[in-house]
């Protein structure tokens, strides 16, 4: 803990915030030495910004040993000054990259190193102690050295290690323009491009290759060609390539992979009979994998062979049944076949939240409304049920006690009973009344939490000298969180000071202080504290401009990136809206432009509005299409019906990732209900 010192002159902070660095330097010159760490930091920044990086280092070196918690901020400033002098920033950044360092410090140090590697001499990069780097940075350094040094072998080594990160995509994009590689190497490059979302580049690379002769190489060429065509929406060409892959497959693994991809193409194309045969072929090749079972069971129901599907379940391996069983039961309920759905549900472990949720749907479909309410109460009170709880609430019909007032309560089980029997509005009102009577929560509900008194530490010291952005980005963990009121202040302050993901986390921690309360039961007055208006302001503006439902866009962005403009996924998706490179091309922007948060939000809002126009006012379909693609979702609706019950559609979705995604988006929509 830094020892208490007199607060700095407010004029210093005002000058820092306004970027008047000459004034900062002049004010600092009048202060007694030694300078407190925060003032030493802004003095050094003033020197660096005014073109005196050597002077900045002179200020930082004596201050660093007594910097305490501010050492990370001072090391980062030292690294920037070293870079300005053309020096290697590694000596300043190395301590911040060790595992004990807080994640924000590691991220900031990594970002500084990435910039340094673009400009420092190649010899300097080659001298970086790679073993001291985290694995991801080690790979990025290898790519930087390979690209700048024209070293094909080093770039290929990055691909040989793994293909699902940003370093692999950068290496593959560079290698794609190089010449003289054998076919097997070209295929490895194409694979990395596909995984990284650069589908068109992969397709062009594959199209330039002559058909290989050796069976295993020919299989990989045909399979990757089929995947690229599928991703680009060219289903006839995908089918042709995948048929070639199936014809030359020499192992069960190859037959499984090709059959799964070819079955998806057939199903999307509306050829259910062929798709069923392909799903069965996948199941025969790999009977302990989910995909073959799932597709075969689903299409048997679609083709009117539900009894056969239920019979097959008896031979399903237990780990597979946990996944495909709920999907089959949901598909049967979508077809209004509760008797067979019950048979399937009886074979599924009832501790699964989705199985219990489908049990409520089954009871309602068979007219057992009171039994359904009782089952819903148990589910609603169980935090392990997650976002399935909101889906159950949407299922329940109004009861005789609907909207009747309930006494104030914060008890999760009591709130569950109120919601199931008197409705969501009554449960919200009961919780709101209980919180309003609690001094720890009343000011949170009023949306006016003041700055906590007695707040100290690194983040506070940085804010006192006008470095609020650094306080939020480097020390979000040092913000007050002792009481609900402090958490509400922290959530709003973090976003105002420039750290939206940390603000979202603080708001969600505030929600967690209520225990196992579903998002649907949160009082509207509490929602701005959990999801601050400043956090979603960009979404609100973009959605209104593009004609998209505001809560839908908020829910999607919350799930896609947690409002992080620098987010990058293993699938190559970039930025706050998580578009892949091919989507950027379709939308008329470059991948680099997707890192512009406001631009990306407008593009996302346009996509949501377009999908809503295609699928109508149905959040599940729109969110699923944003995640899995509209062609895929259209094929599901062709099988499940154009207006399926939302809960059943989510549970029946063949893609587990998409099902979870839609549930999370729906939860976010509840949180954004005040907008």
Indicate where each model-derived feature is located.
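Generic helix N-cap/helix-start motif at coil->alpha-helix transitions
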Residues: 2-10, 33-42, 67-77, 86, ...
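Structural motif corresponding to the intra-repeat A-B loop/turn of tetratricopeptide repeats
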Residues: 18, 50, 85-86, 120, ...
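Residue-level recognition of tetratricopeptide repeat
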Residues: 13, 45, 80, 115, ...
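Catalytic glycan-binding domains that act on GlcNAc-containing polysaccharides
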Residues: 322, 343, 350-353, 357, ...
